[in-house]
Structure formats: C-alpha cells, structure tokens
Amino acid sequence: MLDRKFILQNAQLVAENSAKRGVSVDVDAICRLEAERMDALKQAEELNRQANEVSKQIKSAKDNDERQELIAKGRSLREQKDAAGAAQDRLEAEILELQTILPNMTHPDVPEGGEHDANEIGRGKTPVPEMDFQPLDHLQLGEKHDLFDFEGGARVAGSGFYFLRNAAVRLDLALQQFAISHLAGKGFTPVSTPDLALTSVLQGTGFNPRGPETQIYSIENTELNLVATAEIPLGGMLSGQILASEELPLRYCGLSHCFRTEAGAAGRASKGLYRVHQFTKVEMFAFTLPDQSTAMHEEMRELECEIFDALEVPYRVIDTATGDLGGPAYRKYDLEAWMPGRGESGDWGEVTSTSNCTDYQARRLNVRSKSNTQKGTDFVHTLNGTAIATGRAMIAILENHQRADGTINVPEILRPWVGCDVLKCE
C-alpha cells in the first residue's frame, strides 16, 4: 500500500493516479479521517495526562471525601480516554480500508488507457511462422497426440480442470526444468513453495481473497487460501523481516501450482489450456533496495525474453497501459506469444508478465532493510515475473512448431528432458 504521509501530502496526485488506473476511491475521505484520527489521538493523550495528574492528587488528598471525589474524576477521565482511543482505532480501521484500495503510483512512461493502448516495445528473435497449411489449435493437436483429457478432468473437479497425458507430461516437466536451470544459472535460488497461504499474506501482496470478483479459492472456516501464483508465498516468505542491505538484491525462482477461479472468463480465445483453474508456474521474485528495482525489472524482462527465444517461440513485448496494471504494480511488461490457433486466424496471447511493485507490497508485509552504517530501516522493493506458465507455453510451442503432417518439432533446448526431437502421431 502507499505511504500514508505521501497520500496526505499528495492527495490530488494520488486521486488522479487512481482514476487513470480505473480505481474509485475517496482520497479526500482519507485526509478527513486522518485529521479526525489525529484529533482523537491528541484528545486521548490529553485525557491520559489529566488522569495521571488526578492519580497523583489522590495520594495527597486531605480527607476521604476529597479522595472519593478525585477517584470518581479519574475514573471519568479514563473512560473518556478509552472512548477517544476506541474512536481512534475505528478511524484507523476506516483509513486502512480505503488506503488498501489505492493502487501503487505509476511510472511516468506507462501509457495511459486500457488493453489496446499498451505499447509494443520489442519482438523476439523467432519470426511469426508462415504456414502453407491450415494450422491446428492446441486442442486439435492434443487430440491427435493424446495429450490432454479435459472430459476426465471435468468428471473429477469440474470444468476448467484437466489431465495431461503422454508427451504433454514430459513437455510440462521439461519446461519447469529448463526455466529453473536457466534462472539458477543467473543467480536465482530455486524454491518449491506451499500451495496455501494465509489471508494476511494474500492481502499483503495485493490479492483480494473475498468478494464476487476474487480469483482466489478460499478454504471455508480457515484463514488459508490456495495460491494464485508463487508471488504470494515468495512475498510472504520474508514478511516482518529486516534484511541486510549489503545482501540485496535477493533473487528467487519459485515453483508452484496456481489456482484461480477465473470468474467471468469465457470465449473462444480462452479455450483449452489458455484459461484454466489449475496450472504450474515458475515465478521469479526479488527483494531489492529502492535504487536497484528499475534495473532488476529490466533484468527480469530480459530473462523472460531469453527463455522464449530459447523455446523458438515468436513473441512481442508489451509495456502495459494504466488500466491493465495490477494494484501493486508501478510498471508491468507482458510477453505475448503468437498462437496460430488462437481466435479465428491466430492472435497474440499473454505468456508472461513482470512487475516492479516498488515498496507497495513490502509496506504491507513489513519487509525492511538496514545497512551496517544506517540507524533506521527502509522498506525494500519487491518485483515478480513469470519465467514459465507451463500451460500457455505449451500452447505456443505446440501451435508454432507443428508441421503439415501433424507432427510437432520439440524445441532443441527441451529435447534432453522430453527425450525426442519430434512428437509423432501414434
């Protein structure tokens, strides 16, 4: 969340930023409630001072009548102090509720608008393939090669769940192995994360586990939720900690299952593996000093490009517009892969995103840094980025590497794990 002092000193700027990002929140109400809270705090402190003074007077009371009168006065003052304290707590809760709705501030170079206003800022090394045959989509290819079982998945867990079969299992594992190996070679520590996280951790990382638009599966009568991304447990892993500035940045790559309700998602472009309720992902996450986060964001974007260049998948790099930024993101880049079977005649589909969240998550999670020469502490910056979401990466590989006879070339980088060069129809 944003620093409250910053909000109060820059109320108009914060309100304008929220409007650009499509978030409706009454910033003036935050300022008004904070003024009331400060008044209640001052009142409580003054009443406490008076009550302490009365306590001293009781000890030197001349007689019992005076003592009883002072005791009654002290009791009244403490009751008033408690009421002022309760008012302060109530106002604090109201402010915090509004404060957590506010999105992060926005990088000045981020384009303003919605999905169609995003800027394309680059392309991958692999060109969009020119196919002299009618390409199949990944579901048709999956049927030919016996790769997916959506009907069986629906019988087990409902629509949006599936079984991977045969070569799809090897391909899924190969993508995980490749991404983790690549990132480990770049200084990232591999981590296998819990699939559950406390509600406080979700809220700290900017995810809303409640409400009609939530993407989170919550476990009834508990404070636990299935994680939508490894960003959640990786961010919470160091919550409440003070990190040594000299050891930053800390780089992690987290392997997790991801669970999402995908409420409201439907349509031809979302079919098959593109939008499901459970998938596997390797996620990059970093804790940095404030002056390191911009460089780390560019590093994560470059790593995503390296991974998809190695997979020989055509993609474009998108600088996401204000209306599509998640609440914690100061700036976000997406990689969109070309998918020949998407839509009516092929289209781009998001396969990765990487966000610089500055101190927005760290402030709520209370992750700070301190150097050997520093008296106080500072909030760190946090960043996250998709290395591989295996389902969508599989779509891009199958559809771009298919051949006219229905066989599928396996990207060279994955062959040691997949165990073959070409997937052939059985």
Swiss-Prot record:
Query: Which SUPFAM superfamilies has this protein been placed in?
Result: Class II aaRS and biotin synthetases, tRNA-binding arm
Q: Tell me which Gene3D superfamilies the record gives.
A: Bira Bifunctional Protein, Domain 2 (3.30.930.10), Serine-tRNA synthetase, tRNA binding domain (1.10.287.40)
Q: Which GO terms describe its biological process?
A: selenocysteine biosynthetic process; seryl-tRNA aminoacylation
Q: Which PROSITE patterns match?
A: AA_TRNA_LIGASE_II
Task: For this UniProt record, give its keywords in alphabetical order, as a comma-separated list.
Answer: Aminoacyl-tRNA synthetase, ATP-binding, Cytoplasm, Ligase, Nucleotide-binding, Protein biosynthesis
Q: What's written under domain?
A: Consists of two distinct domains, a catalytic core and a N-terminal extension that is involved in tRNA binding.
Subunit annotation: Homodimer. The tRNA molecule binds across the dimer.
Protein's name according to its UniProt entry: Serine--tRNA ligase
Q: Supply the source organism for this entry.
A: Rhodopirellula baltica (strain DSM 10527 / NCIMB 13988 / SH1)
